[in-house]
Amino acid sequence: MTSQKQTRRAVLKTLAVTPVLTSLSALDSWAASILDETGKRPRVAAIYTSFTYRSHAHVLLENFLEPYLFCGKKTDPGVEVVSLYRDQQPAGDMTDQVSNKYGIPVYRTIREAVCVGGDKLAVDAVLSIAEHGNYPVNDRGQRMYPRKRFFDQIVAVMKESNKFVPLFNDKHLSYRFDWANEMVATTQQYNIPFLAGSSVPLAERKPAIEIKKGARIVQAISIHGGPVESYDFHALEVLQSMIENRRGGETGVKRLTFYEGDQVYQAAKVGIFDMELADAAMTAELGHSIKDFGKLEGEDEITPHAIVYDYVDGLKATILRVGKSSTRWNFACRIKGSAAPLATSFYVGPWQNRNLFKALAHSIQTHFRNGSAPYPVQRTLLVSGMLDSAMQGRLATGHPLQTNHLHISYKSPDHSALRENGDSWKLITEATPEPERFDNGLPANLK
């Protein structure tokens, strides 16, 4: 890795004094093409909204530019980031620092970044991270991140160049389901390998449960401890990752109801969602059940909410907020014929949620190198719709909302090899100081 960085710097330095190339864009394009031939690693454009400490751009890119731990092993990214685009430049922006350290040019537009300064697509994959930054919030409480705008501008260059390369979209596809649906339809039309979604489903499971393919899941619950919408998304991705291979595969959602505050307790009391499942999920994390969704020992009090989904095939599933903890990701389900619920807690590793992105980076890099998504983007398409509809349902809590547009069916291949198995946290432990810089924490003896 070090020699490749030195090669890149050397080429850029040499080209910088070559009079034949009279523009910086031509210089960058030629340098990148030379390095592509010598390095033979997929060339990646990184497009992001904001790059500050612990932002998604930070915690993903630190595992793209250096080797990192995955399942306890030093892992080479296997790709080369050759261009950067930032949509905003807030205080604490890390773009220039990283650009200078790694010799990666920063471009003023998305088009320039994916063309690496030239006039046609010049990368083998695109990393789109539209998370964090100063963007407006609509009347439903949805942060209007420009994921669709990023997507449209990236794909426009692919169309013009008649070259279609793997694309990753961080988190949900869009705050608008119609846009999310259009994005997936476009990638299908042009055979663009498309991956999206959350880091949490790839986390270590404690206990390390597995749900057999074809299991007859009757009811499920996914619990988080964060804000409405932004953390509901991750809980939905956890939910789908656990239930999508049930008997018959995914069938989609026909109805949802949003409950908030006292409504949550009433819904639990009358059996709208299964309290035994909630207890099992919380016990997986804490070792005991709880009595109050809104106030846990050592945590600030919050107003709980629950989103109950009725699936086309009869499954019922609930997203439940419990307490205030950014690292709370718990799941439980009831399988027909089993006496006790099956439950687990998703352990994020040390340093809050930062280390979650090692496994996600590994999945994205696998996607870029193989040219095919390791798990279906339809999961995130369905989740995008479930989340958008939930925010609509929140405007009339306690009242069912029909979701005929979410009858989305899909099946997911086995991708368990892409999940963290916990061995990394034997090397990076809870006692390991978190780096306060662009540094993924790879132990010194492995560098």
Task: Locate the predicted segments by residue.
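C-terminal segment of classical bacterial N-terminal signal peptides
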Residues: 22-29
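N-terminal glycine-/serine-/threonine-rich beta1-alpha1-beta2 phosphate-ribose binding loop
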Residues: 31-167, 175-182, 188-190, 244-292, ...
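Residue-level detector of anion-binding/catalytic polar loops
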Residues: 105, 193, 400
